Structure formats: C-alpha cells, structure tokens
Regions:
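Alpha-helical solenoid scaffolds in eukaryotic macromolecular assemblies
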Residues: 1-260
Length: 260
C-alpha cells in the first residue's frame, strides 16, 4: 500500500508529497528494507545525493543486515567518496563483526591500493575472530593476500599459526592450501613438512571418527616415527592406549594388545 501510494505521487510529479509518504513509511516500518531502497532511489534519481545520504544514515541507525550496509558503501563509491566508504566499513565491521565483513573491508582497501590498511584489517580481524567457527576462511584470505603482495614468509607464518590454532576438524581447506603454497614457494624440507601435516590431519580425522580403529592409530604412529619426534610418538601412543575396547570385542583386543 505504501509503495503504491508513493508511486502515485511520484508519477504525478508531486515530489514533496512522495517524500512525505516515504518518510512516514520508513518511520512506521523501519525493518522493511524495500521502503528504504525505494526512498533512497527516488532521491538519487532527483540528484539529491545529500538527501539520499541522510536517509541511509537514518537506516543504518537501525543496524540493518549486511546488504543494507553494502548498498550504502556502493552508493558512496558511485560518487568516488572513498573516505566516506571507509568510514562506513568501519561502522559495518563493528555492527556485524563477522569474518566475511572483515574480508570485504580488506579487499576494499586492497582494491584502492592501500596495502598497509588492508593488512591492518586482517590483523584486527585475527585479533577478534581467531577462535571463530569461520576462522579458517579468514586465515586463508590473509595468507593469500600476503602471497599477492609477494610476502611469502608472512604468508607461511600465517599458515603455520593457523594450523597450530584451528581445530583439525575445521582446517581441511587450510591444509590443502598450505601444501599447495609450499609446493610453489617452499624448499624440500618445507614441502615434506606440509605433506606430513596433511597426513597427520587425515589420521586425526580417522581416529576422531572411530577411536577404536587401531589400524589408523598404527599408521599414525608410523608417521610420527618417520618424522622422529619422540614427544609426538609418545603422545600418539598414550592417546591410542587410552581407547580401551569393550570387554566383549575380541577383534579389537587383538589389535589393542599390539599397541603395548
């Protein structure tokens, strides 16, 4: 009803009347995004950029969803208002402090040639979201950013920090990217370490899914023995023998005894 009412006023070129209708509509129904979009579109078509900006500001005070914020940013970029867009991004990541929000902010800075600002976005995001469920996506984006900047050592440090920090069950893509990275930039030792890390990840997944899969525990132990870290070998043995099979399961006991 509000849309039709405003449309009638606009068709009859009663602009101030249409403005009044839109103003009443967004005041009464501030969560209906379509009303805001239509109101802003009218002002922009009339060349009233300052008025459109004021409407966006009113809308943002309601802390709307991601698309509304991105629409505001695109609006400012249409008029080449880079600093204004940057300021909106700062508010956006505070309102919606998600991995995707920060990655968009960093890519915006990168697109504008602001490498140090982009790096700062990633660093701030890691400080805030290193334990987030989507942290893998953040670390991969950060490492790939450093690769593009020809900073392979920075990228390697990010990958290694992430692999130590993120639970293995949430790091599959990270391992795959790290192995590919080492094949491109690493020496032989680095490549071997990455491959061992990937195999370690696979065994961790197998024993997590089935702790009584003693064949996987043996394979895992052999991997650590090939690496030669006594502490890791001991740790895997201790974890393996902690998984005592049910008393009646003879087939498990035969394999379990060999661990000792």
């Amino acid at each position: 009803m509000w849309l039709k009412y405003a449309d009638v006023e606009m068709k009859n070129k009663f602009i101030n009347h249409a403005r009044n209708v839109w103003d009443r509509a967004v005041t009464l129904l501030p969560r209906i995004d379509q009303l805001w979009y239509k109101y802003i579109h009218m002002e922009e078509m009339l060349g009233n950029v300052a008025g459109a900006r004021q409407i966006y500001e009113r809308w943002m005070s309601w802390e709307p969803d991601q698309q509304a914020w991105l629409s505001y940013i695109k609006f400012e970029l249409r008029y080449n208002e880079i600093e204004r867009a940057r300021g909106i991004f700062e508010r956006f990541v505070k309102c919606q402090p998600k991995v995707g929000s920060w990655i968009r902010f960093a890519k915006f800075e990168m697109k504008n040639g602001e490498i140090s600002r982009a790096r700062n976005c990633y660093e701030r995001a890691v400080d805030l979201l290193a334990d987030d469920e989507e942290a893998e996506q953040l670390f991969v984006a950060f490492a790939e950013f450093e690769e593009k900047c020809k900073e392979s050592e920075r990228a390697r440090c990010i990958y290694k920090f992430a692999l130590d920090h993120i639970p293995k069950g949430r790091a599959e893509d990270l391992y795959r990217k790290f192995v590919a990275f080492e094949k491109q930039y690493g020496d032989r030792e680095g490549i071997e370490d990455a491959i061992v890390g990937k195999r370690r990840f696979q065994y961790e997944e197998e024993v997590r899914k089935n702790p009584l899969n003693y064949d996987s525990w043996f394979d895992y132990i052999r991997l650590e023995e090939s690496v030669g870290s006594k502490a890791r070998i001991r740790e895997v043995y201790e974890r393996a023998i902690a998984n005592v099979p049910p008393a009646a399961e003879k087939r498990y006991w035969q394999r379990y005894i060999y661990l000792w």
